[in-house]
């Protein structure tokens, strides 16, 4: 107990030094969140040992310290990734990297240079609400998870930013129009200017995509339909849809027999949960495991931030147990609140089995086995 108390004192003293230092360097904020992780880990261990007090400090319940530790890990990993970007030398204060800032809309982004926007519902000053418009928003690319800085915008419709050609609203004024008003109309006051309804020019998040030819012989009707859908998609949805179509084409070339499917299931570890997001009427089957053009993979499904943390740990300590990992991805038909995926690629089934028997997957992440065509 004495050792635990001493470690906790040292950890908290270092945190106080950082608060007094009031640094604007990113490395100091990373150290702060590292200490937050250590503090909650020590408190968790103390409670696990049956301690309710360490000196004059009350030890919180296990559920509280566990939640705080997970929160600290999430922010810490995000800052470590930010340190590898072009914005590592920018000014970053404790306020800029706080959990409250991380959870403020747009969530899971870093934000700077906030400006107050006043919205008067029904044009009545007594029915006004204030929102924060962030002029600088730091978000991650869909493809490689690199941090980029985009500009925030204000329109009659709401507050938004444009990233990789997609317009994302983090505040929509119409959601509050009938909460604070009655007519469903409002005025936007920002920077000494007023945006009225008649001045509203909605910005579309879609762009025209050049029509493509049929994907393969015999699929002309289907290809023309898919092309018309692609014309209204953003780059993320279009990219995911084309990958899906490419996957479906390859499955037609390598159909799997029922006997092969049974053999494959029998050869896989029993302690791994196998699931499928398709129903039993899905016309496409998994690629032939013995095909030289197929590679074994594991799809990890869960909360996107948990997946990023787990992928980061794999990259640091288990790099020899797999070939490569994908960025975090979602099906384009699902909302932002749905579970995300990370795909891990292996050079052989023995390497995948070694990975599954060695690496402990966090409880909140679901493991799905499969194969993928070796297209790269």
Swiss-Prot record:
Its main location: host cell. The keyword Metal-binding does not apply. It is found in: Host nucleus. Phosphorylated. Sumoylation plays a regulatory role in E2 transcriptional activity. One of its GO terms (molecular function) is nucleotide binding. Residues 218-237, 246-266 have a biased composition (Polar residues). Gene3D superfamilies: 3.30.70.330, E2 (early) protein, N terminal domain, subdomain 1, Papillomavirus E2 early protein domain. GO terms for cellular component: host cell nucleus. Coiled coil: none annotated. GO terms for biological process: DNA replication; DNA-templated transcription; regulation of DNA replication; viral DNA genome replication. It comes from the Viruses. Pfam families: PPV_E2_C (PF00511), PPV_E2_N (PF00508). Residues 1-206 are annotated as: Transactivation domain. Binds DNA as homodimer. Interacts with protein E1; this interaction greatly increases E1 DNA-binding activity. Interacts with protein L1; this interaction enhances E2-dependent replication and transcription activation. Interacts with protein L2; this interaction inhibits E2 transcriptional activity but not DNA replication function E2. Interacts with protein E7; this interaction inhibits E7 oncogenic activity. Interacts with host TAF1; this interaction modulates E2-dependent transcriptional regulation. Interacts with host BRD4; this interaction mediates E2 transcriptional activation function. Plays a role in the initiation of viral DNA replication. A dimer of E2 interacts with a dimer of E1 in order to improve specificity of E1 DNA binding activity. Once the complex recognizes and binds DNA at specific sites, the E2 dimer is removed from DNA. E2 also regulates viral transcription through binding to the E2RE response element (5'-ACCNNNNNNGGT-3') present in multiple copies in the regulatory regions of the viral genome. Activates or represses transcription depending on E2RE's position with regards to proximal promoter elements including the TATA-box. This is Regulatory protein E2. It comes from Human papillomavirus 28. The gene is E2.
